[in-house]
């Protein structure tokens, strides 16, 4: 779209008149982002931010009122306990992209370790060494 601010701003205003429950964007938080503009145009419609958010990005968006909620996509695939990891500021598992699309391999979807499993495994290895 040549004029995303105007197009999506207008659409959001019209949707707001119809009392939608929320609006959700998948947009990078960079200089060209229109999320803040859309938030201003949304009136009282709650905004859910998403798109490669770090823990710090999410906290900033929520604490500054730039979003009412945040969501995570890919990080939930590789971190079944993402909420706990974010609360504890713990490291995240890296997503294995090679197994995501077009394979019959379950590996990389359901076998990522939780934080407790990762810590237990590390302690076991450290004990054996």
Each model region followed by its residue ranges:
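Flavin-dependent oxidoreductase catalytic cores
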Residues: 1-129
């Amino acid at each position: 779209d040549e004029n995303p601010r105007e197009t999506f701003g207008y659409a959001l205003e019209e949707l707001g008149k119809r009392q939608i429950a929320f609006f959700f964007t998948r947009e990078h938080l960079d200089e060209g982002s229109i999320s803040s503009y859309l938030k201003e145009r949304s009136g009282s419609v709650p905004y859910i931010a998403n798109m490669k958010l770090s823990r710090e990005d999410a906290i900033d968006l929520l604490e500054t009122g730039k979003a009412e909620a945040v969501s995570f996509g890919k990080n939930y695939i590789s971190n079944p306990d993402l909420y706990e990891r974010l609360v504890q500021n713990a490291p995240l598992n890296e997503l294995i992209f090679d197994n995501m699309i077009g394979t019959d391999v379950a590996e990389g979807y359901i076998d990522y370790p939780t934080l407790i499993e990762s810590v237990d495994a590390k302690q076991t290895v450290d004990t054996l060494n």
